[in-house]
Amino acid sequence: MKGIVLVMDGMGDRPLKEFDNQTPLQAANTPNMDEMAKNGITGIMDSIAPGIIPGSDTAHLSILGYDPYEVYTGRGPFEAAGVGVDVIPGDIAFRCNFSTADENGIVTDRRAGRIREGTHEIVEVLNTMVLEDYPDIKIIFKESTGHRAVLVLRGEGLSDKVSDADPKVEGNKPKEVIPLDDSVEAKKTADILNKLVVKSYEMIKDHPVNLERIENNEPPANIIIPRGAGEVPVVEALNDKYEVNSACIAETGLIMGIGRFAGMDIIEMEDVTGGIDTNLENIRDTIIDQVKNSDHDFFLINIDGADEAGHDGQAVEKRDFIEKVDRVVMSELKKLEDVYIFLTADHSTPISVLNHSGDPVPVIITGPEVRVDDVCEYSEVAVAKGGLCRIRGADVMNIMMDLMNYAHKFGA
């Protein structure tokens, strides 16, 4: 028996006036998800705990059965591992954004117009960076999907106890990175990052990719903004923890990195962006091929577009993307036999918030021996009446392993 945990990143939301006080999921036409709800057991889930606002990283760790309060060291190492950068003990890794700044250093677009092409060429220039005051520190950049990138600092005397440079909203300069403790290492690392942000603008503002973007009235990716400092985490292999053969199918470096640290096989895909313009047909075909033809028996799958729309405040686009996932992906996945599917989100990304929130997310479990409840619709409101009631992310793997007959009895 095989199992799938399919996470629609950021799908949860709050009622919107433009949808007659419905969420984008409620407003969406999702006949396939509704059919799954009718044929499955439903409920709502707090990825970590009620009211706790999870990151995508901490939410996925919890969903995979890890305690994020114990294993989470920061976002950076997971992002780095996800794009193929080997992070070694002593390294400090960061998630970065390619962003747009004006001549006064004001950030005018935190995601550089959701840039899709040219970041590899920009990174080639950034990887020649040497800071005059810190020539012994190796600076490693690597592009990820879209506007995302990673930074790894390698050298002696570094610390992950530093703040983020991300201003969170446009119209401000990058935040000054400050040490979060009084150590020499934290002060040194903060100084390196502040100098690096300034240097990045100097190095790439006139890059040919950016000059072309300006000519095309597109925001240039002319500054790097790091956040999510972290050192190498210690994560028990998922295959050892649950005695499964697992794989991760994801679009973004963050989720692939979590999968790598968890020892999962990473199934890479072409032509996926992590946005609403991603190639859902490729994602669908990859899932079906792996489930039918590989020897993996457990899959973590992440589809990211709804989260992007939530962050950008695009209500219609979020609704439409959910509908497209239903039409393209779920219409075929629901036909899989001898497979348990756990469909959920990692967190809510409400249009009104433009960020994550602590609202619980909807859950469906379908499969051969699921106890079917009387819920017939997949939405945040409808599934709250379901047979699973309200669970936490930490419950997901226990439930799935039990259904798949991989669980062990507790007690005599």
Curated annotation (Swiss-Prot):
InterPro entries: Alkaline_phosphatase_core_sf, ApgAM_prokaryotes, Metalloenzyme, Pglycerate_mutase_ApgM. One of its GO terms (biological process) is glycolytic process. Its EC number is 5.4.2.12. Keywords: Glycolysis, Isomerase. The keyword Cell division does not apply. Gene3D superfamilies: Alkaline Phosphatase, subunit A. One of its GO terms (molecular function) is metal ion binding. The keyword Isomerase applies. It comes from the Archaea. Pfam families: Metalloenzyme, PhosphMutase. It is an enzyme of class 5 (isomerase). It catalyses: (2R)-2-phosphoglycerate = (2R)-3-phosphoglycerate. Coiled coil: none annotated. Pathway: Carbohydrate degradation; glycolysis; pyruvate from D-glyceraldehyde 3-phosphate: step 3/5. Belongs to the BPG-independent phosphoglycerate mutase family. A-PGAM subfamily. Catalyzes the interconversion of 2-phosphoglycerate and 3-phosphoglycerate. This is 2,3-bisphosphoglycerate-independent phosphoglycerate mutase. It comes from Methanobrevibacter smithii (strain ATCC 35061 / DSM 861 / OCM 144 / PS). The lineage of its organism: Archaea, Methanobacteriati, Methanobacteriota, Methanomada group, Methanobacteria.
